[in-house]
Amino acid sequence: IKLEETYAKSTLIKKNNKLYGLISLPKFYVDFDDYKERNCASDVKKEILKLKKEGMEGLVLDLRNNGGGSLQTVVDMTGLFIEEGPVVQVKSFGDRKQVVYDKDPSIFWDGPMVVLVNQMSASASEILAAALQDYNRAVIVGSTQSFGKGTVQNVIDLNRFLSNSKFDLGALKITTDKFYRINGGSVQVEGVKSDITIPNRLSYISIGENDEKNPLKWDKIDSADYKKWDRYFNLDEVISSGNDQIEKSQLVSLIKENAKWIASRQNPKSLTLNYLDYKKSQSDDKNYLLRFDDIKNYKNDLEFEFIANDEESIENSKEILERRKRWAEGLQSDFQLNEGLKVLDNLKLKVINKKSIIANND
């Protein structure tokens, strides 16, 4: 069964007479039986090549609601955007640590880049976002911070210790390692903090590793040896002005107010058992929610153009068109995406004389 909705997908976006690319990655997937046959890093590379062929001028990588997956695909995917270098550090007990490297010097996209995250971007998503942030390779746009899962778990089957048992003894999941950014900081609990913060309807809901019982604490180790990407001409300026614009946005003020209202409705201390009182409460809520119609009715001015894959032309085109139609409808009301594209609009690259190591073929 093909789980198409979990695979990487892309679209071209027209904004202000410019052409941008969006790649959505819901999960870091891999075929463990045959890594080369299917993995998300290879799929993202294919989408980049497709978008570049059409003249993409900037890239948005959407990691929202991506709960993680294969570490190897994170390393390979980071390598699509940087020259060779460290991607993540892994530390177990004692002073031992392992630095995991991208060893391929080729780059498949060296233009402006934005990464979208939210509170549900976790684990492998955080490793990728953190690495691109530490390298100054991409601007992270989204919730105040990501989920904050910076640990590695191994599952131990207890049945192997007692082979003659008539009962299923189950398994133990044990935390064995922690992930660290290449700058030395952990993503545990604190997650990846966005460069440009955009609230959403869940901003005041308790979501994340820090809201679990007894989470491991944040800590820091020595930085890995890496060189920051220095092609942006105005990175700090774009981040500063982006946050200023968000603070002044009337829609953002509404989103914050709505998020606070949603949080206030969680775990109420009391509920009326009187039907008339309950009915009035529901009516009051309905009237109050009318003030948030601007959020519900929000539409951006983006134009989307989907590029067909060779294999898609052979498959059921009606099903593919229906999927893309649903995706486009969601994107047309996506405020965070539109703000990410504004960042791409403003990012300027330095002109360099030396020849970049850019890969055009796979």
Where do the PLM segments sit?
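Cleft-lining beta-strand/loop regions that shape enzyme active-site pockets
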Residues: 1-161, 329, 333
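A residue-level signal for beta-strand positions that form part of recognition/binding surfaces
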Residues: 19-22, 171-173, 215
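Flexible glycine-/small-residue-rich
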Residues: 24-27, 63, 117, 174-178, ...
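Low-complexity, polar-biased intrinsically disordered regions enriched in Pro/Ser/Thr/Gly
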Residues: 32-37, 157-169, 317-324
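Mature, folded catalytic cores of secreted/periplasmic enzymes
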Residues: 70, 99-100, 139, 166, ...
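Polar, glycine-rich mid-to-C-terminal structural blocks
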Residues: 124, 136, 141-207
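Conserved functional hotspot residues or short segments at active or partner-binding sites
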Residues: 181-359
